[in-house]
Amino acid sequence: MIWFVNLYVKIVTRVIKLKHSDDEEFQLKFISGGMLSTSELSLLQAKKEIALYGQRTQRMFGMVKDLVHEKEGSETFSKIYSRIEKYEKISDRMELEIAAYLNQVADGRLSYDGKLQVSAMLTMTTEIESIGDSCFHLARTVIRKQEAKVEFNEGIEKDIDLMFKLVSEALDNMNLILDKNDMAESDSVSYTHLRAHET
């Protein structure tokens, strides 16, 4: 029976590693297949992609927090910084791809309300990318702190932890709003297509 448990552990560990690896590779989940049959459906897919973008960026911020609390110069410290650096590149590419997709949607047949949605979604994408940039700049600041051999006292560390807590809460709220917008739009589009099919 023990051999079965060991095999199970190996399988689970491998699956977790694969998921972890996939998440750190550039890939679009909802808009990689191109435009859909209607502009409304295309916008819905873009909203889902933006929501995923927000989640990835929040994960990146969590890495910065881990970096700050990790022992400087350790192997784990270097690995975390490398992950942040990789996420920053992914963030840049996601912004470009989402923006290109939205511009393609805007070039098609789109209502005035739809054009306003595209404009708002482009702004969201730019702001999320800016958060990713800020995360990377924070990580680089931690590296410079290490190189300069600067030490923070207990008071400064508490203030930094408080700021991390507040920003984490803000990102939680941001992603909650993005998810709610996505769900509301999904329900609306589904109902519209159902009514169209009935008539």
Explain the meaning of each model-derived region:
Residues 1-195:
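Cytosolic, long alpha-helical scaffolding segments
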